[in-house]
UniProtKB/Swiss-Prot annotation:
Entry function: Catalyzes two reactions in de novo purine nucleotide biosynthesis. Catalyzes the breakdown of 5-aminoimidazole- (N-succinylocarboxamide) ribotide (SAICAR or 2-[5-amino-1-(5-phospho-beta-D-ribosyl)imidazole-4-carboxamido]succinate) to 5-aminoimidazole-4-carboxamide ribotide (AICAR or 5-amino-1-(5-phospho-beta-D-ribosyl)imidazole-4-carboxamide) and fumarate, and of adenylosuccinate (ADS or N(6)-(1,2-dicarboxyethyl)-AMP) to adenosine monophosphate (AMP) and fumarate.
GO BP annotations listed: 'de novo' AMP biosynthetic process; 'de novo' IMP biosynthetic process
MF (Gene Ontology): (S)-2-(5-amino-1-(5-phospho-D-ribosyl)imidazole-4-carboxamido) succinate lyase (fumarate-forming) activity; N6-(1,2-dicarboxyethyl)AMP AMP-lyase (fumarate-forming) activity
Origin species: Aquifex aeolicus (strain VF5)
PANTHER family cross-referenced by the UniProt entry: ADENYLOSUCCINATE LYASE (PTHR43172:SF1)
Protein name: Adenylosuccinate lyase
Cellular component, GO, one term: cytosol
Record family assignment: Belongs to the lyase 1 family. Adenylosuccinate lyase subfamily.
Catalytic-site annotation from UniProt: H144 (proton donor/acceptor), S265 (proton donor/acceptor)
Sorted UniProt keywords: Lyase, Purine biosynthesis
Chain positions recorded as N(6)-(1,2-dicarboxyethyl)-AMP binding sites: 4-5, 70-72, 96-97, 215, 266, 271-273, 310-314
EC number(s) given by UniProt: 4.3.2.2
Length: 437
């Protein structure tokens, strides 16, 4: 991922230095396992533990060797073994490259997922704050982009909060399914390494054992993870799109924060554009798109080919880095979000009370009219309001078939927006439960 969208913490996870450090963690864990089984002398293990390291200079040496070897793992093993000397012969004993690479990849993924989980928690806290702060902030609910029924901005935040909670649960599930390693040799048969080494090494690394590995940990695990990252990005795009719609000049119900000195357009000094929400929408496309090659990586030849490797070097870092970036960007948007309550009220008035059509329909059917007949009456009055300067209340009171069954007081009550929202506490209880207190 380009530097512009890379935050340091996540960028460090996917750095070359950290990758090779994780490879070294795996190699040392395997050496310790061999030592416990009496196959590596204790003094040799001690030297391996004390002498081996990875920093930027070591990474450069590995890259230089790779130019000759055309194999990054062999280059890594050669450089690390040189650090130790004679005892370096024990490094990589009985292993195949994927024993190291796939197991280390799980360690990298664990670090990356845990950062994303922290990001999600931050975002959820801000959404929750807005939900309670705007529990009674009246606005118009829209379906198909058209005014529907009264709503509150707080209820909109309840929807966002619950969706992010689902995404967090999905990520935790994907985390459980992807934190697997394997130390089982070239085709998973433990031909040059006993299962005890795998058990001891993976236990030290905090990973589970792939039950039926081949040369690799199977890529359906990683595909599930990438799909989950795409789902999280899709939710963020959904929320960002909502902000973009609500920031339209004609709507202007919410606005992204606009900081001192910020400029919106090179040509039009008046502009306040929802650029951060637009950026979220753009990067979400990249993250979501990466789930497709992840699923294609599931299809490998026989016990393994290398077609997935080049793909993962791109899609895993890019997806995590971009998602980390847009989660934090969305958090900043929420922190400074401007909610225009007065504009929400004025926009409600544009529909002239037509949002009450459903309640008038119910009232008429309760008076004994058939639903079809009542529907025709209400629609007739609604169309008159749309096509004239009159309010819905006025057209209802002018219609003798309405006033034959409904009093003005009943119509007034039906037009009260809070009549639509009397059960909002129930929604909050469902979403927040004990947190309501």
């Amino acid at each position: 991922m380009i530097e512009r969208y890379t935050r340091k913490e996540m960028g460090d996870v996917w750095s070359e230095v950290n990758k090779f450090k994780k490879w070294l963690d795996v190699e040392i864990a395997v050496c310790r396992a061999w030592a416990k089984l009496g196959k590596i002398p204790r003094d040799a293990l001690k030297k391996i533990e004390e002498k081996t390291y990875v920093d930027k200079k070591v990474v450069e040496k590995i890259k230089e060797k790779e130019k000759v070897f055309k194999h990054d793992v062999l280059a890594f093993v050669s450089v690390i073994a040189e650090q130790v000397g004679e005892e370096g012969r024990y490094i990589h004993m009985g292993l195949t490259s994927s024993d190291v690479v796939d197991t280390a990849l799980a360690l990298l993924i664990r670090e990356a997922i845990d950062i994303i989980l922290k990001d999600i928690d931050k975002v959820m806290e801000e959404i929750k704050r807005l939900a309670f702060e705007h529990k009674d902030t009246l606005m118009m609910g829209r379906t198909h982009g058209v005014h529907a029924e009264p709503y509150t901005f707080g209820l909109k935040m309840c929807v966002w909060y619950d969706e992010m909670r689902r995404q967090k649960e999905r990520l935790l599930f994907a985390r459980e399914n992807v934190l697997y390693g394997k130390i089982s040799g070239a085709v998973g048969t433990y031909s040059n390494i006993p299962p005890e080494v795998e058990k001891l090494a993976l236990e030290e690394l905090g990973l589970k054992i792939e039950p039926a590995s081949t040369q690799i940990v199977h890529r359906d695990r990683h595909a599930q993870l990438l799909t989950t990252l795409g789902l999280i990005a899709s939710s963020l795009e959904k929320f960002a799109t909502e902000i973009r719609h609500l920031q339209r000049t004609e709507v202007l119900e919410v606005l992204e924060p606009f900081t001192k000195g910020q400029r919106g357009s090179s040509a039009m000094p008046h502009k306040k554009n929802p650029i951060h929400s637009e950026r979220i929408c753009g990067l979400a496309r990249v993250i979501r798109a990466n789930s497709i090659p992840a699923m294609e990586d599931v299809v490998l030849w026989h016990e393994r080919d290398i077609s997935h490797s080049s793909v993962e070097r791109v899609i895993l870092p890019d997806s995590f880095i971009a998602l980390d970036y847009i989660l934090n960007l969305f958090y900043e948007i929420l922190k400074g979000l401007v909610v225009n309550k007065e504009r929400m009220r004025k926009n409600m008035e544009l529909s002239k009370g037509l949002y009450a059509s459903s309640k008038i329909l119910v009232l008429l059917t309760q008076k004994g009219l058939s639903r079809d007949y009542a529907y025709d009456i209400v629609q007739r009055c609604a169309m008159k309001a749309w096509e004239s300067d009159k309010t819905f209340k006025e057209t209802l009171l002018e219609d003798p078939e309405v006033t034959k069954y409904l009093t003005e007081e009943e119509i007034e009550k039906a037009l009260d927006p809070w009549e639509f929202l009397k059960n909002r506490d129930y929604v909050y209880e469902k979403v927040f439960g004990d947190e309501m207190g």
